[in-house]
Amino acid sequence: MAESVEKLEDGIVRSAEQVSAQIRAAKDAIGSVIFGQDRVIENTLVTILSGGHALLIGVPGLAKTKLVETLGVTLGLDAKRIQFTPDLMPSDILGAEVLDESTAGRRAFRFIAGPVFAQLLMADEINRASPRTQSALLQAMQEQHITVAGARHDLPKPFHVLATQNPLEQEGTYPLPEAQLDRFLMEIDVDYPDRDAERRILFETTGAEETLAKGSMSADALITAQRLVRRLPVGDSVVEAILSLVRSARPGEESGEAGKFIAWGPGPRASQSLMLAVRARALIDGRLAPSIDDVLDLAEPILKHRMALTFQARAEGRTIPDVIKQLKTRIG
């Protein structure tokens, strides 16, 4: 029995070393095209390795679309993009059945797949579409299949959605409800690049030749990596840190002083997301097990879209990141 366990552990170690090298190569390849967004790249890779979806928040012109295109090439995924608008219908995303007539004169319905049938889908400005259209995509994200005219159609594997939102323009938008926000593993802030990164952007993107992304992985290799993430061991101290942090982010006794600022907090799905994400981050760094530092670093992007502040907190000028930072001091 002990020998079989040892063989299993050796197999995980060898697989982890191989997968970690592939992921680091992919990360470097993406970084050679997307400048000054290292944290965004890492968190996006963590989301994908965890098998989840991400919501990218940033003003226009910060390479969000370029990031998705580059991820598709680097990870060997079929990538597509949907520009969400108020008149976009669910059938524009999912697909529809059309009536075809054969050469013999026979008529039959044929399903034409929509752009949701991709391995990596960019939902650009998702909050501009109607709630009905948003729900169609978010249901597909959760269930990994769609149903049209009573027929089930499975989505390709892997299937990941990277949705974007512009934090400045709120007129004519439909904010995502809390239940739908919870389906995104992370909310990732895309900030302006620093001065050195912007200087590099000027030189490398305005010349005669443009740097193109190179493939580093395949879809099958990514699926293997995602399965490996779920097999990585997690220490009891890390599990307790996850439980303490997520439970303290809810109103109640466990939140302590911060409880008076929290109107509602994350459910068990946040704990699941954090458990997967810390494993994925450890694998990217070449480690076989996550640490409490991983929990603290990933707490904000995983928790902040799953929380709301009380009127008192907003009146005092507090923000959700402020509250999460306060909660983290009780863990680390």
What is each PLM-predicted segment?
Residues D124-E125, A136:
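Walker B catalytic acidic pair
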Residues V59, I93, T164:
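P-loop (Walker A) phosphate-binding loop of NTP-binding proteins
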Residues M1-V13, E17, E253-G332:
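C-terminal engagement/docking regions of AAA+ P-loop ATPases
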Residues N43-V46, D100-M122:
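Conserved alpha-helical scaffold flanking the Walker A/P-loop in AAA+ ATPase domains
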